[in-house]
Amino acid sequence: MVGKPLRWMMTNHLNQKPLSLSGIPWFCYVISIASTCIAVGLQWDISWHMTIGRDTFWTPAHMVIYLGGILGGFTSAILVFNMTFFDKNEGMNSGVKFWGFTGPMAAWVCIWGTVAMLTSAPFDDWWHNAYGLDVEIISPPHMVLAAGFIAIVFGAMLLTLVQQNRSNVSNINLYSWLYTYTGGILILLMVILTTEYSFTNKHHSLEFYKISAIVYPVVLVAISKSSKLKWPATIAALICMFHRCIMVWVLPLFEGQPLLAPIYREITHFVPPPFPVLLFIPAIAVDLIIIKSDKMNDWVRSAAIGFTFVSLFFVVQWYFSEFLLSESARNWFFSGHFNKPYWSRMGPYEFKFWEYDYRGFGPPIPLTPVSIAGLFSVTLIAAISARVGFWWGEWMRQVKR
């Protein structure tokens, strides 16, 4: 009795018309919502720690994060269940077998991500009980959590990408939009994970540009190479920026105050993240180079993207960061005066470029000044990152399982 309605809802989800909106299967929307929950919850959780301190596990921010994980895992489990028991022909043609079950590759990636996220919860609680408060975002339990939510977002990209690669002309743009949207969420996750290396005060240091050259070109190139939209890298970068700006503008609307010492500044509302980098500007160049150089060798294209990315990103962020530290940015739009946590001591250093990396433990670490030789090494890193992006993007174009 239960199997019939489930079979009616799920049968031939790739070839027939399942429950859908505008011809797009329901699971594509749900998995995109799951990715959004993860991104929103992560930024909210970081703001919660910067505003209130460590709280119970059952905070609303944590619940939004794990809602995203459970949505992604549950949706993927339904797809695996359907392909294993109801849609065996499709499973033989396009499924991936694991432990006797058959499902789309993207579903297995999401399920693994959900398991990792759920495993990280007790691990993180034990870590805090054993070692106290976190002084950095990057800790062993947080890396397990990060592996989980990156897997879910990557699985969401794969799920919508398969639909794009197998769809007809009538709805291919809708799949491409969902794919590019989840790609924008992946870029946002990279922004979140590198927060401590990319404070505005570090934008005149070589370390900031090295980190940016590692994480951004690879994703931008892969999205631009595999999406069938026009200007996909630019759209993904704008989606990332839009999400970040929404958090900058919305979080300070809600009241909050510190509950855990030491408290070095008065906080009355939730602390927003720093204003996002202007990644869409070099993303335009990435799209343009890929469009105009289709017949060129990928190594040459990677070198061109590496040089162009670093040139544009360096010039834009060098001067934009000066603006963000000025009095002109101390308003609700840019939030230049209100993005430091309550445990950060107040002082003139808040609005200056740092010469040292001030960590939560140990002595300050000197930051490397930007130089011509340093920018050359950053360009080389960006070119290698772009080349990996070409490999990744070419593989993504061929994914149909």
Whereabouts are the PLM-identified features?
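Membrane-interfacial loop-to-transmembrane alpha-helix junctions, especially the N-terminal start
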Residues: 23-36, 101-115, 169-183, 228-239, ...
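N-terminal signal-anchor module of multipass membrane proteins
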Residues: 2-74
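Hydrophobic cores of alpha-helical transmembrane segments in multi-pass inner/ER membrane proteins
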Residues: 3-4, 63-81, 143-160, 210-228, ...
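Aromatic-anchored segments of alpha-helical transmembrane domains
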Residues: 37-42, 116-122, 185-196, 238-252, ...
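Membrane-interface interhelical loops and short amphipathic "cap" helices
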Residues: 43-63, 123-143, 192-212, 248-269, ...
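Alpha-helical transmembrane segments of multi-pass membrane proteins
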Residues: 235-287, 296-386
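Membrane-interfacial, low-structure loops and terminal tails that flank and connect transmembrane helices
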Residues: 2-24, 85-105, 163-179, 396-401
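Membrane-interface helix-loop-helix junctions at boundaries between adjacent transmembrane segments
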Residues: 94-110, 122-181, 195-206
